[in-house]
């Protein structure tokens, strides 16, 4: 086992990068440090005027920005640039999301800089955005989490804070037994001039097993959920015989990693109704179908130990769930507030306990 104790260190990163990865480890602990970026990829602006002639806004002092060659607002930093035309609106004094605003469309056609660092967008019109409203201008690009865990066993994160990441705060896949104690995705206190934290989920667990234990955390200002726990389904694309199928990853951001191994227990889900169909089965053999190796593969050829139920075909739409890679979840004594989307998402057939959490102005 390895313990990384930051002793209160505040790690500030630059450009576009993945701050910390923990891969193929066992009995490791990360504790007592924080992660942030000098120049976030989200551009925070304040509404100065809003009316029939459009919106006038001023970027926050740390935002590096310009009008690009297409005439759009563009934020930039070391090795990156971004021209957002969407955003999330926050109340100036409370840092809560503006009621019933959801994802904003912020068109920048015809943008003009009417005085130093003050811009007028004539096509951006929204009566809900009163002067003083703070908008986090953003794209939906999320290339890197703050912390990435993969193929780890018995991992503990204690007193770790992620103040910003251009993706999830914590992304874990194919891990067994993860404990979060005082892990937070949060602002730097009440006087932090920022209104946002991460570009996506605060914590995200994909195809993990064992137990996910998350407690005593603060999750605020993120552009998605506080926690999302799920497996990764494959869709049956071809039914070759009563034991064999070709199945495919369907989400464009979820492929190229090991979906399962020989002996894994699976079940089948009818996509139209989310009902289980047939009995449980086991993988006898699984091979990448569209690549020579698992890396980069989107399709697998899977042979099952037992015959498939007659209802399971490639005509209707069936997903395969790997039961050997599903976790129990304990989520307790956390605060979730002032975020886009939902508070918590749990998609696991195993025991899930959610208790003593405070949900304060989650917008989804």
What is each stretch, according to the model?
Residues 90-142, 277-329, 337:
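Small/polar beta-strand repeat architecture
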């Amino acid at each position: 086992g390895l313990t990384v104790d930051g002793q209160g260190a505040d790690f500030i990163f630059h450009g576009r990068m993945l701050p910390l990865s923990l891969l193929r480890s066992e009995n490791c602990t990360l504790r007592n440090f924080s992660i942030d970026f000098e120049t976030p990829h989200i551009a925070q602006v304040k509404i100065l005027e809003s009316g029939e002639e459009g919106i006038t806004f001023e970027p926050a002092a740390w935002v590096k920005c310009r009008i690009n060659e297409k005439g759009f607002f563009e934020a930039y930093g070391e090795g990156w640039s971004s021209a957002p035309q969407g955003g999330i609106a926050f109340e100036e004094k409370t840092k809560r999301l503006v009621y019933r605003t959801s994802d904003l469309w912020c068109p920048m056609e015809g943008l003009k800089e009417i005085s130093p660092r003050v811009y007028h967008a004539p096509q951006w019109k929204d009566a809900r955005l009163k002067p003083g409203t703070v908008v986090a201008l953003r794209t939906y690009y999320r290339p890197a989490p703050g912390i990435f865990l993969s193929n780890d066993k018995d991992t503990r994160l204690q007193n770790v804070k992620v103040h910003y990441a251009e993706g999830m705060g914590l992304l874990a896949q194919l891990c067994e037994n993860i404990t979060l104690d005082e892990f937070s995705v949060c602002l730097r206190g009440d006087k932090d001039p920022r209104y946002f934290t991460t570009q996506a989920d605060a914590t995200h667990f994909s195809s993990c097993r064992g137990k996910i234990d998350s407690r005593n955390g603060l999750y605020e200002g993120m552009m998605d959920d506080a926690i999302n726990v799920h497996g990764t389904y494959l869709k049956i694309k071809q039914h070759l015989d009563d034991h064999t199928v070709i199945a495919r990853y369907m989400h464009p951001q979820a492929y190229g990693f090991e979906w399962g191994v020989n002996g894994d227990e699976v079940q089948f889900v009818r996509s139209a109704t989310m009902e289980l169909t047939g009995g449980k089965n086991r993988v006898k053999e699984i091979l990448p179908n569209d690549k020579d190796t698992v890396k980069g593969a989107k399709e697998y050829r899977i042979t099952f130990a037992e015959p498939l139920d007659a209802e399971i075909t490639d005509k209707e739409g069936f997903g395969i769930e790997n039961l050997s890679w599903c976790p129990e979840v304990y989520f307790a004594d956390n605060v979730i507030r002032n975020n886009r989307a939902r508070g918590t998402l749990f998609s696991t057939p195993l025991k899930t306990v959610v208790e003593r959490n405070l949900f304060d102005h989650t917008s989804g």
